[in-house]
Amino acid sequence: MHPITYYPVDTQRLVRSNAERIRHKPYAHYFNPDVAVPEEVFAALKAPLEPEQVLGTSSTELNRLLEPGYLEGETGYCGLPDGAGYTSSLVRFPGATPEMFRWWFWWHSFEPERYSLWHPWCHADIWRTDPETETAPNLTDEQRYVGSTHHINEYIGQDPLDIEITFIDPARWGFDADGFAAAGIGAHACGSVLMKGSHMRLATMVHLARITDDGFELRSRYWIADRAEPRHDPVAGIAQLTTVPGFSGERQAYEQLVHDQTEFNHLATFLPDIYQEFGPR
């Protein structure tokens, strides 16, 4: 593992604020600003993927993620001809289980301090409109986040983003969810990412946790500014994010790869332990 050594100035302020805010929380001992990524990731950051390595969003393409083995370009980024972007990311979680992943995806969302554990430098705030879901009886882990919207403030690179992520049943996008178990997929977190305020679609996000001999591996895909699908009326005159002057899908895809690799490799360092301490009894 190699440490991340570039921290934009605003994220330097944020990590200090996060460290102070979390001090009196019972899980404060999991706050660790030392973040690192595997050496092989750096090669993926030096040049974009080739067009033939980009996975599409049709049901046929998405279900290639259920096939045994790996696809070309499991970790990488690129811009697309229409100005959109694409990010793929593979992160391994030794000693962890899909049950831990499902628990984390609802547990972290009810306090910003929990959220900051995941990426101390870039995660600023999170809240939900359904706080009662945290303690509601007789819900599965999936039911505590699928169908819910997480309101998030974070940095992707040096850019602060106010976004909303609505988590969905992956079958809605054409995944053969009935085939997940046979493919070794034990958990998922798929969602639509919208810009807060304008409700312009920022990304389509897929996380699939596939069981391995020593834990699980997380295979992620982001299609950035892939289509116009506002949940509410968009800002007048703007139909899609790629039409915004100065928007670069390629740059956003690159920064998303750095962010994803950093946060999920960091989560892998403490997920088994925090689940053991704060997970279900």
From Swiss-Prot:
Keywords of this entry: Hydrolase, Metal-binding, Zinc
Binding residues for substrate: Y115, E154, M205, V206, H207, Y222
Effect the entry attributes to changing H108A: Abolishes activity towards phloretin
Annotated positions binding Zn(2+): H123, E154, H259, E263
Impact when changing A203S: Abolishes activity towards phloretin
Regulation of its activity: Hydrolysis of both phloretin and MAPG is competitively inhibited by DAPG.
Disulphide bond pairs: none
Effect annotated for changing H207A: 23-fold decrease in activity towards phloretin
Enzyme class: hydrolase
Cofactor: Zn(2+)
InterPro entries registered for this protein in UniProt: DAPG_hydrolase (IPR041526)
Effect of mutating E263A: Abolishes activity towards phloretin
Any one Gene Ontology molecular-function term assigned to this protein's record: metal ion binding
Annotated EC: 3.7.1.4
Catalytic activity line of the entry: phloretin + H2O = phloretate + 1,3,5-trihydroxybenzene + H(+)
Function: Catalyzes the hydrolytic C-C cleavage of phloretin to phloroglucinol and 3-(4-hydroxyphenyl)propionic acid. Can also hydrolyze monoacetylphloroglucinol (MAPG) but not 2,4-diacetylphloroglucinol (DAPG).
Subunit relationships: Homodimer.
Entry protein name: Phloretin hydrolase
Taxonomic lineage: Bacteria, Bacillati, Actinomycetota, Actinomycetes, Mycobacteriales
